[in-house]
Amino acid sequence: MKQGIHPDYHPVVFMDSATGFKFISGSTKTSKETVKWEDGKEYPLVRVEISSDSHPFYTGKQKFTQADGRVDRFNKKYGLDKK
């Protein structure tokens, strides 16, 4: 690898804006905002809108929408649906 061309990889705290959930991970992302972590060190804080703590897929609150197929739309259009 060439020296001096790669971004700095360092630990960063990511915070879910919706829930306040925080986790630490390695990243090249940086921020002027910092936060003191559980180990007593200060790390850059990056706010994210959605994380595994608030995303419906991971929380189990996912809504499944059933899109009508072509046959269902045809039946509705011509009044052939069974109700």
From Swiss-Prot:
GO terms for biological process: translation. Keywords: Ribonucleoprotein, Ribosomal protein. GO terms for cellular component: ribonucleoprotein complex; ribosome. InterPro entries: Ribosomal_bL28/bL31-like_sf (IPR034704), Ribosomal_bL31 (IPR002150), Ribosomal_bL31_B (IPR027493), Ribosomal_bL31_sf (IPR042105). PROSITE patterns: RIBOSOMAL_L31 (PS01143). The keyword Ribonucleoprotein applies. GO terms for molecular function: structural constituent of ribosome. Part of the 50S ribosomal subunit. Belongs to the bacterial ribosomal protein bL31 family. Type B subfamily. This is Large ribosomal subunit protein bL31B. It comes from Lacticaseibacillus paracasei (strain ATCC 334 / BCRC 17002 / CCUG 31169 / CIP 107868 / KCTC 3260 / NRRL B-441) (Lactobacillus paracasei). The gene is rpmE2.
